[in-house]
A protein has these predicted regions:
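Extended, highly charged accessory segments
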Residues: 40, 48, 52-71, 75-303
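Short, solvent-exposed secondary-structure boundary/capping segments
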Residues: 23-40
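Residue-level detector of beta-strand structural context in well-folded domains
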Residues: 8, 17-18, 131, 175
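A contiguous, basic/glycine-rich beta-loop/short-helix subdomain that forms a polymer-engagement track
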Residues: 1
Length: 303
């Protein structure tokens, strides 16, 4: 519940539900049949993909796409034969490279099909030098803008935070923005699907740093990390030594402590939580590098 927001769609049992209201002791939901939903998680968040690994993955995708022969109609043009479409395949050099990496024929063929389908859907295969923006409508008629990017959550999460802030400041509504290892998803109300891509996604690097540093204190990540910092520093003592404190009680006490700590400027727990979010979780230097590349044209933004 602590990591959920009004409007989120979740799966519970065999049904999907949309959150309408979150109060102190209950969550009000309504049925949302047929909607794409996420499963409630029962464990802590895992670390996001490292920028270096994401860069290597994007470079590999780019190199493989350069060696891809895309599917095309057969020369006989017979629409009634199974040979009308030639399968996508890699050139000999790329196929041999994949074989040396341990892939068998079926794996190589499936990888070629995957890249071909991606190129068919978006026109460009996302890589370390090409980010792809895709627009579509969801089941409810709202717009989704999907940024395909390989750089990982440590880069995407602060970028998503900045995008959320810009949407609210410039357009006056709260857009739902989600970051994952393979990109960022924006959900916008009907009528806002044609917002300019560059205006939404591109930031001056100093402005970007300032927005993230200012807004991180209001994020769900900050709340969770503050609780962990408070527990480590013994600000959340156990009422019964040796007994486990339920997580909901830890969160309640941490929220009360956070409200009190905000009245004290430069309170050590606040500073440590901000440092942990901005340095240990987020990779702001990498995000600045990417944003500089987008402005310089060394990284392309395709739509």
């Amino acid at each position: 519940v602590y990591e959920s927001r009004v409007g989120d769609v979740i799966t519970l049992g065999t049904s999907t539900w949309q959150i309408q209201e979150i109060t102190r002791d209950r969550v009000v939901v309504v049925p949302a049949p047929g909607r794409t939903a996420r499963l409630p998680f029962w464990h802590g968040d895992q670390d996001g993909r490292d920028y270096g690994f994401g860069l290597a993955q994007g470079r590999l995708t780019r190199e493989l796409s350069q060696g891809l022969h895309r599917r095309e109609p057969a020369k006989n043009g017979d629409q009634n034969t199974a040979q009308t479409v030639l399968e996508a395949q890699f050139n000999r050099e790329t196929a041999q490279r994949l074989e040396r990496d341990g892939l068998d024929h079926n794996a190589i063929s499936n990888l070629a099909k995957l890249l071909d389908e991606q190129c068919e859907a978006t026109g460009t295969i996302p890589s370390d030098r090409d980010l792809v923006v895709e627009r579509c409508r969801d089941e409810g008629g709202d717009w989704r803008i999907i940024i395909h990017s390989p750089y990982g959550r440590r880069v995407h999460e602060p970028w998503a935070l900045a995008i959320t802030t810009r949407i609210k400041q410039r357009f006056g509504f709260d857009g739902q923005v989600y970051a994952v290892d393979d990109g960022i998803v924006l959900r916008l109300p009907d009528g806002y699907g044609d917002l300019p891509t560059r205006e939404l996604l591109l930031f001056d690097v100093d402005e970007l740093q300032r927005i993230v540093e200012t807004q991180v204190g209001e994020s769900v990540l900050y709340m969770a990390r503050f609780r962990e910092c408070a527990a480590r520093s013994l600000f959340l003592p156990r009422t019964r030594p040796g007994k486990r404190v339920p997580l909901w009680q830890q969160r309640l006490k941490a929220a009360q402590l956070l409200n009190a700590a905000r009245t004290c400027k430069n309170f050590p727990l606040l500073l440590e939580t901000a440092r942990e979010c901005l340095q240990d979780v987020y990779d702001l230097p990498a995000l600045r590098t990417i944003m500089t590349g987008l402005h310089a044209g060394t990284i392309l933004l395709s739509e």
